[in-house]
Amino acid sequence: MLKVLSLRSALQRAASTRQLVYEGYRNPPEAIQLKTVTIADKPSADQVLVQWIAAPINPADLNQIQGVYPVKPALPAVGGNEGFGKVISVGSNVSSIKVGDHVIPDRSGLGTWRELGLHQENDLFPIDNTLSMEYAATFQVNPPTAYRMLKDFIDLKKGDTVAQNGANSAVGKHVIQICRILGIKTVNVVRSRDNLEELVKELKDLGADEVITQEELYSRKKKFPGVKLALNCVGGRSSLFLASLLDHGGCMVTYGGMSKQPVDCPTGPLIFKDISLRGFWMSRWYDIQKSPEKRHEMYQELAGWMKSGEIKKQEIVKNRLEDHAKALDTALSKFDKKQFFVLE
């Protein structure tokens, strides 16, 4: 009888945990609420119990809470698409993940702004346990986006040239660094600003070969022959002139639309240079890429560059869950440093 009671007691054990939840779509600082909930502290057969360690606030997270992102979790939902955590316990059927592993989400909308979470095994992916917090928490989105765009559209060789706008974005900075590692030259377009000289130095320190303003791009005074690949996250006039830099058979890949303007394409290069236009969304790559080997290969190479210091850490600002309104407001208005929730 005592054994039966002990087993029943164990099965009914629960853990209290805090998480950032939204119940409707609106301005993130107003939509997000800090809630304490109770979850089982023992995973079922196919589940994994994760202690989340750190999670960034990304533009996609903000768009999701605003209701304008393609992926919409069922409401109420926990915020956060990216982050990393440590596996506390695993269910009896779990085979690809073990206790002590560091894991990241394997799908969008998982909800990483929480202290503890019970997740299905196939919703998580193990990563290198030795990566520091700044690398591990942002390992899923920006570095792989840069990596895949450089690998999947044009067969780039050492000495080739890549041009990009939004070069000071997180993806743009990873493009610069990966190109430097691979021996590929970069032409980097940024907006004019008061601290332009400081920004140019920062990007050149990362390995940028050329840094020009959008106005310099539009003037066409500078020539950049042999551009094989162009990466566009702005759209509008910027994409028009960026595509004009492409050599014969070149490709412009669009992965964002910061200007909220349609992507423009120059007629002459499209006809006479046979340039192509493609789109890229990292979430879709994860959805259709069912081979764990290809992902392991990418993660291993990126982790190696991070641990060697060839890819530098992002500057971050650490926030507690209870300071969520301020953190979200800052993430909406300032873009120089990545806002993080530290969850341990």
Curated annotation (Swiss-Prot):
- Example GO BP: fatty acid biosynthetic process
- So where's the catalytic machinery, residue-wise? Y69
Family annotation (CDD domains):
ETR (cd08290)
An example Gene Ontology CC term for this record: mitochondrion
Is Transit peptide among the key words of this record?
yes
Q: Name one Pfam family in it.
A: ADH_N
Q: Which reaction does it catalyse?
A: a 2,3-saturated acyl-[ACP] + NADP(+) = a (2E)-enoyl-[ACP] + NADPH + H(+)
The chain's transit peptide is found over 1-14
Per its UniProt record, what InterPro entries does this chain match? Answer: ADH-like_C, ADH-like_N, GroES-like_sf, Mito_Enoyl-ACP_Reductase, NAD(P)-bd_dom_sf, PKS_ER
* Keyword terms, alphabetized: Fatty acid biosynthesis, Fatty acid metabolism, Lipid biosynthesis, Lipid metabolism, Mitochondrion, NADP, Oxidoreductase, Transit peptide
A GO molecular-function term, please? enoyl-[acyl-carrier-protein] reductase (NADPH) activity
Task: State the Gene3D superfamilies in the record.
Answer: Medium-chain alcohol dehydrogenases, catalytic domain, NAD(P)-binding Rossmann-like Domain
Oligomer and partners: Homodimer.
State the function annotated in the UniProt record.
Catalyzes the NADPH-dependent reduction of trans-2-enoyl thioesters in mitochondrial fatty acid synthesis (fatty acid synthesis type II). Fatty acid chain elongation in mitochondria uses acyl carrier protein (ACP) as an acyl group carrier, but the enzyme accepts both ACP and CoA thioesters as substrates in vitro. May provide the octanoyl chain used for lipoic acid biosynthesis, regulating protein lipoylation and mitochondrial respiratory activity. Involved in iron homeostasis; affecting Fe-S cluster assembly and ceramide metabolism.
- What protein name is recorded for this chain? Enoyl-[acyl-carrier-protein] reductase, mitochondrial
The species this protein belongs to is Caenorhabditis elegans
